[in-house]
């Protein structure tokens, strides 16, 4: 039994690709047909590829490695955050800051600043500070939380894989992963280059339900892998 069924994929609209004029010819092997000017993705291939990705993510998780979820487009933001939290993983869903992985020591300073302001908020410091100062700090906290909240506890050396929604949009994240030798699993639509990705899941990266379905499956794989890790111990 496959980890994801054709019925689930159809219901979520995973098969709808982009308009035929906006395509990457390298995606041809994953295209089933063309309908009303839109490419239809071959869901049999999606089933197979999703299974490969699932097994890989499960294996990475069993080894005790972390998976970083990345998806900053509107349709992906909630699923990326919710599923990363559900599987106790890390995520970037607002903006990929240059050097997030390749210059992590600098990013770490910003994370420390985030923790510092959070502590001030919790220990009552805000109550004794001038109102103007508190407003300024709250604004800074909100911005830091938005960009770095999902990687507060990230250990850059322990990332075993990156899961990406829309490799075209997240090309900077992918290039940093490549530099560090981190394998990339991604939902790849008909306008993307599959060669940029190690584990391609051909599918619609613009429909919220489609993104949620596949992202949730990757979170399931992590949780299954973690169970295996606990049993091995």
UniProtKB/Swiss-Prot annotation:
Recorded hits in InterPro entries, A to Z, give: Ribosomal_uS2, Ribosomal_uS2_bac/mit/plastid, Ribosomal_uS2_CS, Ribosomal_uS2_flav_dom_sf
Which domain of life, per UniProt?
Bacteria
SUPFAM superfamilies from the UniProt entry:
Ribosomal protein S2
Q: Which GO terms describe its cellular component?
A: cytosolic small ribosomal subunit
Q: Which GO MF terms does the UniProt record name?
A: structural constituent of ribosome
Can you supply a Gene Ontology BP term from the record? Answer: translation
Which keywords, in A-to-Z order, does the entry hold? Ribonucleoprotein, Ribosomal protein
Show the HAMAP family listed in the entry: Ribosomal_uS2_B (MF_00291_B)
Q: Which family does it belong to?
A: Belongs to the universal ribosomal protein uS2 family.
| Name of the molecule in the record | Small ribosomal subunit protein uS2
List the source organism.
Clostridium botulinum (strain Alaska E43 / Type E3)
**Gene (name only):** rpsB
């Amino acid at each position: 039994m496959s980890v994801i069924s054709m019925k689930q994929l159809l219901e979520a609209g995973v098969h709808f690709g982009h308009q035929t004029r906006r395509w990457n010819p390298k995606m041809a092997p994953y295209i089933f047909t063309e309908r009303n000017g839109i490419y239809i993705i071959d869901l049999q291939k999606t089933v197979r590829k999703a299974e490969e990705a699932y097994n890989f993510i499960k294996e990475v998780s069993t080894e005790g490695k972390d998976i970083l979820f990345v998806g900053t487009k509107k349709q992906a933001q909630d699923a990326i955050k919710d599923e990363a939290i559900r599987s106790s993983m890390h995520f970037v869903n607002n903006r990929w800051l240059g050097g997030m992985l390749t210059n992590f020591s600098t990013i770490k300073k910003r994370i420390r600043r985030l923790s510092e302001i959070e502590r001030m908020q919790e220990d009552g410091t805000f109550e004794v500070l001038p109102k103007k100062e508190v407003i300024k700090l709250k604004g800074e906290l909100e911005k830091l939380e938005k960009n770095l909240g999902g990687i507060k506890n990230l250990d850059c050396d322990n990332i075993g894989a990156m899961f990406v929604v829309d490799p075209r949009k997240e090309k900077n994240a992918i290039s940093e992963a490549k530099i560090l030798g981190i394998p990339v699993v991604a939902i790849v639509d008909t306008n993307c280059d599959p060669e940029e990705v190690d584990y391609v899941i051909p599918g619609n990266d613009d429909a919220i339900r489609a993104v949620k379905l596949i992202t949730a499956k990757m979170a399931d794989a992590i949780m299954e892998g973690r169970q295996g890790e606990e049993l091995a111990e």
